[in-house]
Amino acid sequence: MNPELSLSVQYGVAEPRLPRWRLRRWAQRALDGAARDGLAECARAELSLRLVGQAEGRRLNHAYRERDYATNVLTFEYGTDPLGTARGDIVICVPVLAREAREQGKTLLDHAAHLTVHGVLHALGYDHIKARDARRMEALETAILTGMRIADPYA
């Protein structure tokens, strides 16, 4: 059985191409993929996803990572409680997302799907600090995106 998703979507910046239903679909696909992978052992995920502009993205990245620029996605993982509920917050900086999509020759939607999946996996405990963990996370992201007919973002 697939884990249940509770997703709160917040718009710090208007982005009509990224409606709640689309973000929710991508997040659920990531949650389902993580459940199949077996690393994320949760029955439920309570996540927030906030779309922000350049200034807020930069402020958050500086406050939490001491880097004075806006990054594409920030994730705050809060772990899984004893009842199996994973919690986390995901922040996607829309101007960085749009710029990267253009630079990489991707559609905004495909890149947004990738960043959403990436953020959800981080919220579930995946990381890419060690090379082995990075390979596992990237392979899972690619498999999830392939299931949505989105090309391998790492190719």
Curated annotation (Swiss-Prot):
GO biological process: rRNA processing
Enzyme Commission no: 3.1.-.-
Cofactor stoichiometry and binding remark: Binds 1 zinc ion.
UniProt-annotated binding residues for Zn(2+): 118, 122, 128
Annotated family: Belongs to the endoribonuclease YbeY family.
Role description: Single strand-specific metallo-endoribonuclease involved in late-stage 70S ribosome quality control and in maturation of the 3' terminus of the 16S rRNA.
Protein name per the record: Endoribonuclease YbeY
Organism: Bordetella petrii (strain ATCC BAA-461 / DSM 12804 / CCUG 43448)
Gene that this polypeptide is encoded by: ybeY
